[in-house]
Amino acid sequence: LPVYHPAMIAGHIAMMDTLLDGRLIWGIGPGGLPSDIEAFGNQEIDRNKKMVEVFEQVMEIWWGEAPYNIKGEFNTITTKETLTPEIGQGIAPKPLTHPHPPVVITALTPHSHGITLAAERGWNPISCQYVQSHWVATHLPKYLEGLRNANKNEDPRGWRVAKCIFVADNEKLATN
């Protein structure tokens, strides 16, 4: 989320949720690869803090009324001077799913406090495929901790682990 503008995210996610008839699962993350961080100039900022701000600003866009006047530490969003309601200019689309599509957040580091915070917000973690398995093993307890902190049912089924797979027409093709 930190590498995109909240207004663009709000429009794109609302459109995708509508096109998918409310079946969208929205994947978010702070942009954790060192190459991403450098490429987008995010080396000196708190990416987790910016990710939360962007998410909250998207919510304000979706569930607020135009003209928007949303101020944050990292982004300011306004349509007060260009709002033209008769043609829909300056009014963001809203997703089909209320209050927002289900959210999954990337989990990368061992004993990630971000997983706990995500679970407290009702988001589900998805452990990255390219991290060491003993790091991935630390993610479920942190997820359950967040659910406990939020007085939610400690159901581990919200936790996901990403894996690369190849699907082929037959076993021979798949193993070559």
Where are these regions (language model features)?
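Active-site-adjacent structural elements that line small-molecule/cofactor binding pockets in enzymes
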Residues: 1-176
